[in-house]
Protein backbone atom coordinates (compact mmCIF):
# COMPACT_ATOMS: atom_id res chain seq x y z
CA UNK A 1 0.00 0.00 0.00
CA UNK A 2 1.40 3.41 -0.98
CA UNK A 3 2.04 6.05 1.67
CA UNK A 4 -0.62 8.42 0.31
CA UNK A 5 -3.19 5.60 0.34
CA UNK A 6 -2.28 4.72 3.92
CA UNK A 7 -2.56 8.36 4.98
CA UNK A 8 -5.93 8.67 3.23
CA UNK A 9 -7.21 5.56 5.07
CA UNK A 10 -5.99 6.88 8.44
CA UNK A 11 -7.66 10.24 7.90
CA UNK A 12 -10.88 8.60 6.70
CA UNK A 13 -10.94 6.34 9.76
CA UNK A 14 -10.26 9.30 12.07
CA UNK A 15 -13.09 11.29 10.46
CA UNK A 16 -15.45 8.35 11.03
CA UNK A 17 -14.44 8.14 14.71
CA UNK A 18 -14.79 11.91 15.17
CA UNK A 19 -18.15 11.96 13.38
CA UNK A 20 -19.44 9.29 15.76
CA UNK A 21 -17.87 10.42 19.06
CA UNK A 22 -17.49 14.17 18.50
CA UNK A 23 -14.97 16.37 20.32
CA UNK A 24 -14.59 16.58 24.08
CA UNK A 25 -13.32 13.18 25.19
CA UNK A 26 -9.87 12.34 26.49
CA UNK A 27 -7.31 10.87 24.10
CA UNK A 28 -7.66 7.16 25.02
CA UNK A 29 -11.21 6.53 23.72
CA UNK A 30 -10.24 8.07 20.37
CA UNK A 31 -7.14 5.88 20.23
CA UNK A 32 -9.06 2.68 20.92
CA UNK A 33 -11.84 3.53 18.46
CA UNK A 34 -9.36 4.56 15.75
CA UNK A 35 -7.50 1.26 16.17
CA UNK A 36 -10.81 -0.59 15.83
CA UNK A 37 -11.83 1.43 12.77
CA UNK A 38 -8.48 0.80 11.07
CA UNK A 39 -8.76 -2.94 11.76
CA UNK A 40 -12.28 -2.95 10.29
CA UNK A 41 -10.74 -1.45 7.14
CA UNK A 42 -8.05 -4.14 7.03
CA UNK A 43 -5.25 -1.74 7.98
CA UNK A 44 -2.39 -3.02 10.15
CA UNK A 45 -1.94 -0.87 13.25
CA UNK A 46 0.24 -1.09 16.35
CA UNK A 47 -0.64 0.80 19.52
CA UNK A 48 1.82 2.20 22.07
CA UNK A 49 4.77 0.80 20.11
CA UNK A 50 8.00 1.11 22.10
CA UNK A 51 10.98 2.71 20.40
CA UNK A 52 14.35 2.41 22.13
CA UNK A 53 16.37 5.58 22.48
CA UNK A 54 20.12 5.14 22.02
CA UNK A 55 22.64 7.60 23.35
CA UNK A 56 26.40 6.95 23.33
CA UNK A 57 26.08 3.26 24.19
CA UNK A 58 23.13 3.76 26.56
CA UNK A 59 19.86 2.16 25.45
CA UNK A 60 16.60 3.37 26.99
CA UNK A 61 14.15 0.63 26.04
CA UNK A 62 10.81 1.81 27.45
CA UNK A 63 11.17 5.56 27.51
CA UNK A 64 9.32 6.24 24.24
CA UNK A 65 6.00 4.81 23.07
CA UNK A 66 4.37 5.84 19.81
CA UNK A 67 0.58 6.27 19.97
CA UNK A 68 0.00 4.41 16.70
CA UNK A 69 2.16 3.02 13.92
CA UNK A 70 0.14 2.19 10.82
CA UNK A 71 1.41 -0.33 8.25
CA UNK A 72 4.92 0.25 9.68
CA UNK A 73 5.02 3.44 7.60
CA UNK A 74 3.12 6.21 9.41
CA UNK A 75 3.34 7.42 13.01
CA UNK A 76 0.03 8.78 14.26
CA UNK A 77 0.22 11.03 17.31
CA UNK A 78 -3.22 11.55 18.81
CA UNK A 79 -4.27 14.64 20.73
CA UNK A 80 -7.40 15.86 22.45
CA UNK A 81 -6.30 19.40 23.16
CA UNK A 82 -7.39 22.95 22.39
CA UNK A 83 -4.79 23.33 19.63
CA UNK A 84 -1.72 21.71 18.14
CA UNK A 85 1.29 23.50 19.61
CA UNK A 86 4.89 23.81 18.37
CA UNK A 87 5.95 21.30 21.06
CA UNK A 88 3.58 18.72 19.52
CA UNK A 89 5.15 19.28 16.10
CA UNK A 90 8.65 18.93 17.58
CA UNK A 91 7.52 15.77 19.37
CA UNK A 92 6.40 13.98 16.21
CA UNK A 93 9.51 15.07 14.32
CA UNK A 94 11.64 13.55 17.10
CA UNK A 95 9.56 10.37 17.02
CA UNK A 96 10.08 10.11 13.27
CA UNK A 97 13.83 10.58 13.61
CA UNK A 98 14.21 8.06 16.44
CA UNK A 99 12.02 5.41 14.81
CA UNK A 100 13.28 5.86 11.23
CA UNK A 101 9.66 6.21 10.08
CA UNK A 102 9.55 9.18 7.72
CA UNK A 103 5.83 9.94 7.73
CA UNK A 104 3.67 11.20 10.54
CA UNK A 105 0.28 12.61 11.35
CA UNK A 106 -0.94 14.59 14.32
CA UNK A 107 -4.67 14.15 14.75
CA UNK A 108 -6.33 16.43 17.29
CA UNK A 109 -9.87 15.26 18.05
CA UNK A 110 -10.75 18.32 20.17
CA UNK A 111 -11.96 20.38 17.19
CA UNK A 112 -15.35 20.99 15.63
CA UNK A 113 -14.21 19.87 12.16
CA UNK A 114 -11.55 17.17 12.18
CA UNK A 115 -9.90 18.53 9.01
CA UNK A 116 -8.83 21.49 11.17
CA UNK A 117 -7.08 19.14 13.61
CA UNK A 118 -4.91 17.15 11.20
CA UNK A 119 -1.31 17.93 10.30
CA UNK A 120 0.94 15.78 8.11
CA UNK A 121 4.71 15.52 8.48
CA UNK A 122 7.34 14.12 6.12
CA UNK A 123 10.99 13.78 7.08
CA UNK A 124 13.04 13.96 3.89
CA UNK A 125 16.32 13.12 5.65
Q: Where on the chain are the PLM-derived regions?
A:
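A short acidic/basic microdomain associated with nuclease active sites
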Residues: 39-56
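Solvent-exposed, charged helical/coil patches
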Residues: 1-44, 115, 120-125
